[in-house]
Every structure is written in C-alpha cells, then in structure tokens.
C-alpha cells in the first residue's frame, strides 16, 4: 500500500512538474520554506490511500498534531509528500516521495520514490532493502514477492577507491563543511557528492556513498523512510552529538 501511494503521488507531482505552463504556485510556510500545489496534491493522494489502513498518518503537509498527542501512537505512517521542494522548484529532478511505517519509534517500513528518475527504494524490517528502476505504476497483479524479485538488493557490492561523502545541495552548513574537512584529514581520497532530498540517505544505503552528514534541523518526515531503508541495508542514522 505504501508503494502504491508513493507511485500515485509521484504521478501527481510529475503532472505538475512537466507542465510548461505551471508556475508551481509557490507559497511560504511558517518557517519560510517553500510549499507548492504539488506538495498539497501529493499529500491528498497519499493520505487518501493510507487512511484506508488502521494506522494514523503524520504528514509534513497535513494537520500538525502536537508531540504530546502523537507520542502514544504505537504505530503510525510518517509521510513527506514532496521531499526537496526547493529542488522541485529548481527543476533539477532531485526530489522524492517519502513514506514510512513506524512502530514504537522505530521505522520498520520505508518507501522512497524518485518520480523523475523512476527509481523506487523500498525496505522492510523482515525483507531487507531494495531498489527498483524504471517503475511508474504497479501492475494489477503486483505482489511484494514480485517487487523483490525484480529489484536489486541493497547495499550493492560497489568497488570504490575513495571515501564518498554525500551532502545537501541546499543546506550545506558550516558544521557540515567542518565535518567534510575532518574526513579529508582522515581519508586520503575523499569525493564529495551533492544531492537533494532523501536521495542522500538512499545513496548511502545503496553503497554509492559512505556517509551523509546533516547538521541542519530535521523532522520525523525528513528521515523516517530513509532510516527504514538504511536500517534494512545494515546501516544506521545517529545523532551528530552522540557516539
């Protein structure tokens, strides 16, 4: 159901993204970050599908419930309908649809879809992490087993001769730059990749990057889906100020 929701939201986003007449109807949220009609439409698409399940939905573009209200939810969906709105507005294709199922504070299912690249990352606590390329819709007879069979297991065994750091294209903070400088002192050959949205976490889970440092403020919907994928690929997300 999460994959179906992500793909349908991606289709909705692309219909706006590829429309040459679209000005994206950009608004500003309370924190001054951009919001477009695509964010709103993707949210409605996902919420309509996920609301058919027994679990509540926490979405970046939905009604923001106080933490005291939702902290006792044992199982819930955490959604970012359009992660990387700045990248969407720039039309560089580096935006994603993020959906996670979280149980007792632990992300156990994660789905991240890249509409422009038609790439789907998905993971489950019991099945591992996978990447499927060239997908836009689910077949009528689609099953999880068929999805897994058509996908590549993560991480891939990629041979690299350098330490790869992937960092934010839109939020490269002084703290991140200092971290990268420290990595360069530790490793002889360091390559820096810049990317937008949750693609960065996917690149680490995939084995194309070694680390993604982030020192900018983040919310649950920024990391939940990527965290599930990283965990299922045998990796982890840590707080920067803790060992």
Feature names for model-found ranges:
Residues 13, 39, 50, 85, ...:
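Residue-level signal for inorganic ion chemistry
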Residues 100-201:
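Acidic beta-strand-loop-alpha-helix segment within the catalytic core
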Residues 56, 109, 210-211:
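Short, Asp-centered acidic motifs that coordinate Mg2+ and/or phosphate
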Residues 73-112:
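Glycine-rich active-site/cofactor-binding loop and its immediate structural neighborhood
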């Amino acid at each position: 159901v999460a994959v179906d929701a992500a793909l349908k939201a991606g289709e909705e986003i692309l219909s706006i993204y590829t429309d040459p007449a679209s000005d994206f109807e950009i608004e500003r949220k309370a924190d001054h970050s951009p919001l477009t009609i695509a964010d709103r439409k993707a949210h409605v698409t996902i919420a309509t599908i996920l609301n058919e399940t027994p679990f509540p939905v926490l979405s970046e573009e939905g009604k923001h419930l106080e933490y005291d209200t939702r902290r006792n939810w044992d199982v819930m969906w955490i959604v970012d309908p359009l992660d990387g709105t700045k990248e969407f507005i720039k039309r560089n294709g580096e935006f994603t649809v993020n959906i996670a199922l979280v149980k007792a504070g632990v992300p156990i299912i994660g789905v991240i879809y890249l509409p422009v690249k038609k790439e789907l990352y998905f993971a489950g606590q019991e099945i591992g992490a996978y990447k499927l390329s060239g997908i836009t819709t689910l077949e009528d007879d689609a099953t999880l087993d068929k999805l897994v069979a058509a996908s590549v297991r993560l991480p891939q065994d990629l041979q690299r001769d350098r330490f790869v750091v992937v960092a934010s294209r839109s939020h490269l903070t002084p703290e991140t730059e200092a971290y990268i400088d420290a990595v360069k002192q530790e490793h002889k050959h360091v390559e820096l990749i810049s990317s937008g949205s949750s693609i960065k976490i996917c690149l680490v889970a995939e084995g194309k990057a070694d680390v993604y440092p982030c020192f900018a403020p983040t919310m649950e919907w920024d990391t939940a889906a990527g965290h599930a994928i990283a965990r299922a690929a045998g990796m982890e997300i840590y707080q920067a100020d803790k060992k």
